[in-house]
UniProtKB/Swiss-Prot annotation:
Family to which this protein belongs: Belongs to the mycobacterial A85 antigen family.
Pfam (any one): Esterase
Primary residence: secreted
GO cellular component entries: extracellular region
Keywords associated with the record: Acyltransferase, Secreted, Signal, Transferase
Subunit: Homodimer.
UniProt name for this protein: MPT51/MPB51 antigen
PANTHER family xref list: DIACYLGLYCEROL ACYLTRANSFERASE_MYCOLYLTRANSFERASE AG85A, ENTEROCHELIN ESTERASE-RELATED
Function: May have a role in host tissue attachment, whereby ligands may include the serum protein fibronectin and small sugars.
Localization per record: Secreted
InterPro entries listed in its UniProt record: AB_hydrolase_fold, Esterase-like, Mycobacterial_A85_antigen
Amino acid sequence: MKGRSALLRALWIAALSFGLGGVAVAAEPTAKAAPYENLMVPSPSMGRDIPVAFLAGGPHAVYLLDAFNAGPDVSNWVTAGNAMNTLAGKGISVVAPAGGAYSMYTNWEQDGSKQWDTFLSAELPDWLAANRGLAPGGHAAVGAAQGGYGAMALAAFHPDRFGFAGSMSGFLYPSNTTTNGAIAAGMQQFGGVDTNGMWGAPQLGRWKWHDPWVHASLLAQNNTRVWVWSPTNPGASDPAAMIGQAAEAMGNSRMFYNQYRSVGGHNGHFDFPASGDNGWGSWAPQLGAMSGDIVGAIR
């Protein structure tokens, strides 16, 4: 595996030196961040181009998924999360899509403009493979709040693409009765979104189809590396990022831990500290804390 990864890195560097092109639009990075590109990646499923911040670093990448109040043009991981500086020089690429606010990064049954699972698991990795020389699979997905859910779901349902999942303050048991009610109420309050358009009404049962807790055995069977962080403190410096439901995420993360262990999972790091913010004051340094694990899993 290490030999294959070394070969991929060598081929990626060689390809990059010949200037792989694409239809992306490059923009100037912010002054304090490591140099990165602002790409516009086409999404046929959503019928529009999606803004993606991209930091070249190797053939395997970490995909960073925002909290509920995701930035429309630049990922909050780039701005509040300082992700480009944190991950620069580590031998991996960084992929941070914007525009996924109040979406759960899933495919909505009744909203064609929200087909995030298709974009993140197929359209985006295929585009990056063709236009930036990345490997088609073997990546990591990391996210906060709704992004924590999205990261775990991508790894569970698309193991050919993602071999690492990191969740911070994530909603990892959405089909739980208390949780689906909290998500529905919070997304309506903060985003004006009706979640019946996502997976239908919770009582119809389709929320379970998309639930990492229900499908934790897939993560265990594939030996996917998982990292879960959620503080005992239910406070959130930015309530909109957590749709006012930080306590629900805390409970979800612990229930997910118990389920993961019960189905034989043994490749996880779980941290439930007494202190910490369900917000960027903790999520940004937590990305640094897990960066060694990410690199070890995908580089």
